[in-house]
């Protein structure tokens, strides 16, 4: 029996096409994935992300614990509400999950973990917390709605009350604030501005309806995937997992190597991988017709004239750009051209940094 979010009936009211997503009944689309994609790039769309898990980490050792648990360093967070993105690694340097951590105070943090990895994440966190003066509390009574797009903030402002609008005024990206019953964060998974709003389940349907009434278009998992891929954002389970280290997943920027005495989980393994040289995650664009898909092979010739091979981790047709884009894990000797094998033929592709669209415009 699949889990249902508190917004399940709202999805049905909007003719959501429901599919199983890691054990959750979630909307794939509400009629047109392409229209939903364009709504987020050009106006405002919203996603039910209540299947994600909110976890509060509270206690005297909260900072010390998270400095061990995460490859990024929460000690960098000094301003209440500031957030950072990073990997939770195993002892081999593999990515257990990628998550956002909000600093609320020196003794209180909030992390948001992926639905697909929830049980594994919580088991790992509860194992690692032993010996620390910390309470780890899952918050299943909280739902989450992401409102994204160039007009998302303006439309949300008509829904928020005066207290909430005052709280978010001038808020920079990657911050979160509790305002009355809502935790409102300037984060997202689309490459557009907007909010991710954590809301008590009892209020979630009314908030969803208020956003609908404000002209925010409901969007499903299909558009969520094309938007995040255009933005060059990883999807756990495709672009990385426990068999992949962050250096090979375009997450090297999220590893805080300094100070050298911070012994975060996976550090020793990761230092060895770094010294030996890791694969890298690149972006690919293809002018030819067709769509690059997960699992296809990528070939290129390195500077020594030796053929090298990599693998497509995510691929799609980009509605914004009008051609196929992909992310691929490849040996780090790759240049700026390669070939993808499609239907037993090799098709030329251009190699770029894995970021295709930001704020509605081509990013390369």
From Swiss-Prot:
Signal peptide from the UniProt entry: none
Protein keywords: Aminotransferase, Transferase
Transmembrane segments: none
Molecular function terms from GO: aminomethyltransferase activity; transaminase activity
Any one Pfam family match given in the protein's UniProt record, by short name: GCV_T
Source superkingdom: Bacteria
Enzyme class, UniProt record, top EC level: transferase
GO BP: any one term: glycine decarboxylation via glycine cleavage system
GO CC field: cytosol; glycine cleavage complex
Catalytic activity, as annotated: N(6)-[(R)-S(8)-aminomethyldihydrolipoyl]-L-lysyl-[protein] + (6S)-5,6,7,8-tetrahydrofolate = N(6)-[(R)-dihydrolipoyl]-L-lysyl-[protein] + (6R)-5,10-methylene-5,6,7,8-tetrahydrofolate + NH4(+)
EC id: 2.1.2.10
Matching InterPro entries: GCS_T, GCS_T_bac, GCST_C, GCV_T_N, GcvT/YgfZ/DmdA, GcvT/YgfZ_C, TrmE/GcvT_dom1
Family: Belongs to the GcvT family.
PANTHER family (UniProt xref): AMINOMETHYLTRANSFERASE, AMINOMETHYLTRANSFERASE, MITOCHONDRIAL
Cited HAMAP family: GcvT
Quaternary structure and partners: The glycine cleavage system is composed of four proteins: P, T, L and H.
Job of this protein: The glycine cleavage system catalyzes the degradation of glycine.
Protein name: Aminomethyltransferase
Organism: Shewanella piezotolerans (strain WP3 / JCM 13877)
Phylogenetic lineage: Bacteria, Pseudomonadati, Pseudomonadota, Gammaproteobacteria, Alteromonadales
Name of encoding gene: gcvT
């Amino acid at each position: 029996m699949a889990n249902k979010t508190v917004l399940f009936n709202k999805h049905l009211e909007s003719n959501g096409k429901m599919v199983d997503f890691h054990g959750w009944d979630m909307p794939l689309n509400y009629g047109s994935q392409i229209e939903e994609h364009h709504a987020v790039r050009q106006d405002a769309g919203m996603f039910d992300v209540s299947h994600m898990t909110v976890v509060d980490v509270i206690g005297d050792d909260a900072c010390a614990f998270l400095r061990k648990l995460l490859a990024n360093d929460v000690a960098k967070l000094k301003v209440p509400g500031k957030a950072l993105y990073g990997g939770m690694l195993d002892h081999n340097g593999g990515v257990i999950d990628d998550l956002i951590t909000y600093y609320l105070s020196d003794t209180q943090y909030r992390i948001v973990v992926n639905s697909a990895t929830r049980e594994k994440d919580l088991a790992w966190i509860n194992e690692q917390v032993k010996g620390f003066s910390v309470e780890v509390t899952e918050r299943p009574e909280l739902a989450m709605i992401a409102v994204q797009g160039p007009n998302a903030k303006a439309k949300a402002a008509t829904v928020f009350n005066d207290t909430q609008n005052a709280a978010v005024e001038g808020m920079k990206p990657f911050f979160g604030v509790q305002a009355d019953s809502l935790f409102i964060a300037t984060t997202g998974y689309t490459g557009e501005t907007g909010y991710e709003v954590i809301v008590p389940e009892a209020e979630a349907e009314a908030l969803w309806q208020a956003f609908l009434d404000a002209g925010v278009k409901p969007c499903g998992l299909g558009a969520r995937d094309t938007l995040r891929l255009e933005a060059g954002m990883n999807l756990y389970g495709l672009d990385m997992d426990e068999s992949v280290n962050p250096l090979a997943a375009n997450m090297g920027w999220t590893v805080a190597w300094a100070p050298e005495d911070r012994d975060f989980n996976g550090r020793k393994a990761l230092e060895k991988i770094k010294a030996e040289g890791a694969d890298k995650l690149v972006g690919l664009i293809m002018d030819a017709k067709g769509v690059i898909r997960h699992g296809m092979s990528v070939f290129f010739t390195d500077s020594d004239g030796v053929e090298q091979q990599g693998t497509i981790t995510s691929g799609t047709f980009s509605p914004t750009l009008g051609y196929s884009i992909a992310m691929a894990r490849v040996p780090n000797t790759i240049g700026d051209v390669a070939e993808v094998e499609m239907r037993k033929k090799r098709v030329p592709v251009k190699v770029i940094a894995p970021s295709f669209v930001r704020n509605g415009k081509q990013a390369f």
